[in-house]
């Protein structure tokens, strides 16, 4: 957590300066790898249907999952049959694997399970995205567009459209590549992208801004929708890429927090994690709720979040998809 906080400060922390040689090695390796794919020296899989990659150039939360959910739901409304592929971080395997709504987060991964339940779309997970795309084609021949969650740097899978998410609040941090900074690829990558989309405000590189808004509240133990009594005091936990955003959102909604506790992204929650938080009702994200349902109390609640796609973005994206579908790939 300390390291991530330092990454998103404007100046390079003196201790992080010691990591800059490793960042240069990271830059060399990733650029060579990308060049090999671009030159055809490493094989790439081309799916029979258009592939939309939703990714980012930095680590940490940039709103990819809400974007994938919103994109999938909108495409279904437009008559498309989207399928989602993802890495399945934390999933047990074997891979590739098609996620079922009845799966546990331990089996399928927290984010793929959330996307499966929220969208109703088929979801296939595999560390190698090309394998996931192949299984999707085999199991779901009616799928006519594949949405690849967090696959920007997975060049073994050819893509037709890239949607790069950027957090307008934190931007590109100190501008350094891993491990001295938060970047998987340099800011130059944004200039060559089809679509750069910011959330939580405008960013200089972004063509479109997506509003991410808090949704409804539900009980963690049974998913029953509730009206939260905001006059109470609450404790909050978050095991996501940027926990402070969740806590800030609660405060902006007029919710009084007595305690807030951050955990690492994809944290595997246990009942012991809440031993010091039992004095008040507990609030958490939808992503974390799935991992706490088996031991949740009746006064534990989670909130959904909704990404609102701009109309001009929908129009342009639909036109581009139709063009790709008609053979311009």
Swiss-Prot record:
GO annotation (BP), single: lipid A biosynthetic process
EC number: 2.7.1.130
UniProt-recorded Gene Ontology molecular function terms: ATP binding; tetraacyldisaccharide 4'-kinase activity
Pfam families, alphabetized: LpxK
Positions of transmembrane segments: none
Catalyzed reactions: a lipid A disaccharide + ATP = a lipid IVA + ADP + H(+)
Gene Ontology cellular component terms for the protein in this record: plasma membrane
Keywords: ATP-binding, Kinase, Lipid A biosynthesis, Lipid biosynthesis, Lipid metabolism, Nucleotide-binding, Transferase
Chain positions recorded as ATP binding sites: 58-65
Pathway given in the UniProt record: Glycolipid biosynthesis; lipid IV(A) biosynthesis; lipid IV(A) from (3R)-3-hydroxytetradecanoyl-[acyl-carrier-protein] and UDP-N-acetyl-alpha-D-glucosamine: step 6/6
Described function: Transfers the gamma-phosphate of ATP to the 4'-position of a tetraacyldisaccharide 1-phosphate intermediate (termed DS-1-P) to form tetraacyldisaccharide 1,4'-bis-phosphate (lipid IVA).
Similarity section: Belongs to the LpxK family.
Protein name: Tetraacyldisaccharide 4'-kinase
Organism in which the protein naturally occurs: Idiomarina loihiensis (strain ATCC BAA-735 / DSM 15497 / L2-TR)
